[in-house]
Amino acid sequence: MSNVAGELKNSEGKKKGRGNRYHNKNRGKSKNETVDPKKNENKVNNATNATHNNSKGRRNNKKRNREYYNYKRKARLGKSTENEGFKLVIRLLPPNLTADEFFAILRDNNNDDGDKQDIQGKLKYSDWCFFEGHYSSKVFKNSTYSRCNFLFDNLSDLEKCANFIKTCKFIDNKDNITIPDMKLSPYVKKFTQTSKKDAALVGTIEEDEIFKTFMNSMKQLNENDEYSFQDFSVLKSLEKEFSKSIELENKIAERTERVLTELVGTGDKVKNKNKKKKNKNAKKKFKEEEASAKIPKKKRNRGKKKRENREKSTISKTKNSNVVIIEEAGKEVLKQRKKKMLLQEKLKISNSSQPQSSSAQTQPSFQPKENLFVPRVKILHRDDTKK
């Protein structure tokens, strides 16, 4: 049976090997022959020693590589070992205590005979920073205490300042007295000095072309009111932008005129006049060229073809309009004829129903009269001709 892991086992529960070829090393030998166990032991020992030595060599190489990498990295990223100083943090000062009140209390507690105003000379701090606190307006919220930080160049000066501040009592405007808590900060942040060298781009803005165009455009905006009401970029020359806008407006106007003439057809007469003028000028030029040149040049018949096509299109349009007019006139004539026919039928019906009178019999039928009059024609003869 196969195990869950997919390994085959014997009936005894031992794992099966890959086959007889791997684990039966005495195959092909007689049973009487014996194998020296020392030879096999020596082989095994040599193999283990070799693997152990190889693993040691790899570990040593890794260590060397790490040390070399760390050495290079430290050399590249190494910082200057300057004395950053020491910072004394004074905490748990009264909440409403201000910086002026804090230094006033320090001056009052100065018992030296010297000037009380020169407290920095006594404490010997290089820099200071004060953070003012406040009382909380909510009942269940703690008030924030004020604090002060001093920077010193030496630890001895820091210790003297700390011993002096321990003797002081700080009071705020609400008569709350607190004893401050002082600690040495492990992290000191100092602002690095700015480089005295000027940057490469300092003083080159006046030579920049974009800056020049900007200044010129600002002057033009102040001088001309036309530019102020248009959306032009200030970083480009306003004169060019204005000329471009005028060209665009002219092109748009021409295109709108073309579209309107195509839709409405009002500009046909103007076009025909212009074309006639062009044709006349072309004919004059052609005649002058013929007179100047000895060899006559053939003229292309492009204009004639275009004219013929246009005439055909105009004729078809006029024909269509005439057909419509004729149809309407024919309809009106047919209506009049129908009315006459109806009137004649009504007269016939009325005459058949009534007895015919003598006057009606004597009257001839309604017929159109023929032209009985002979036209008068005069024959004229010339005097020269013989009669």
Curated annotation (Swiss-Prot):
One of its GO terms (molecular function) is mRNA binding. Residues 1-71, 270-317, 345-387 are annotated as: Disordered. Pfam families: Smg4_UPF3. Keywords: Nonsense-mediated mRNA decay, Nucleus. Disulfide bonds: none annotated. A motif (Nuclear localization signal) lies at residues 15-31, 58-75, 284-300. Gene3D superfamilies: 3.30.70.330. GO terms for biological process: cytoplasmic RNA surveillance; DNA recombination; nuclear-transcribed mRNA catabolic process, 3'-5' exonucleolytic nonsense-mediated decay; nuclear-transcribed mRNA catabolic process, nonsense-mediated decay; positive regulation of translation; protein ubiquitination. Residues 30-42 have a biased composition (Basic and acidic residues). It is found in: Nucleus. GO terms for cellular component: cytoplasm; nucleolus; nucleus. Its main location: nucleus. Residues 350-368 have a biased composition (Low complexity). Residues 15-29, 55-71, 272-285, 295-307 have a biased composition (Basic residues). InterPro entries: Nucleotide-bd_a/b_plait_sf, RBD_domain_sf, Upf3, UPF3_dom. Involved in nonsense-mediated decay of mRNAs containing premature stop codons. Belongs to the RENT3 family. Present with 1250 molecules/cell in log phase SD medium. This is Nonsense-mediated mRNA decay protein 3.
